[in-house]
A protein has these predicted regions:
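Catalytic cores of DNA base-excision repair glycosylases
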Residues: 1-152
Length: 154
């Protein structure tokens, strides 16, 4: 793969979002992994972020999943659910969410909590039509309380 061009990679990933950009990043990443890291995925989060296309969230995912680092990757689901249920105080950025969750969730639970929040966001606390009636934690949910308070006053 280090010798592959973006044009060679593209047909394999054309069905995903932003395939041109991702093909370019994958080609650059493969070269860099071989040339600078001996073909090994680095365990250091800062080193991971040097790879083309790898930002903080992706580095944290790799760190948590592959290297069992006690970090909290924040994607759209983690961000939304954390704000809705009150794990954060309506944070404005993924970084604020990450830092707040890392402060209050026991560090050994962070990688698992990341998956819990993603799954909850994908299947229960969805972006457009959250399934509050099916939610096992609606009793403690800030959004649920606010929505019910609003509907009672209308």
């Amino acid at each position: 793969m280090p010798a592959a061009t973006p044009e060679q990679i593209y047909p394999y990933i054309k069905s995903i979002s932003y395939p041109n950009n991702k093909a370019k990043n994958l080609a650059g990443m493969a070269r860099m992994l071989c040339e600078e890291f001996g073909g090994e995925v680095p365990s250091d989060l800062k080193e991971l972020q040097r790879l083309p296309g790898v930002g903080r969230k992706t580095a944290n995912v790799v760190g948590a999943v592959i290297w069992q680092k006690e970090v909290m990757p924040v994607d759209t689901h983690v961000f939304r659910v954390s704000n809705r249920i009150g794990l954060t105080n309506r944070s404005k950025t993924p970084l604020q969410t990450e830092l707040t969750l890392e402060k209050y969730i026991p560090s050994h639970l962070l990688p698992t909590a990341h998956h819990w929040l993603i799954l909850h966001g994908r299947y229960v606390c969805t972006a457009r039509a959250p399934k509050c009636a099916e939610c096992g934690i609606s009793t403690w949910c800030r959004k649920y309380a606010e929505d019910n308070k609003r509907s009672k006053t209308e």
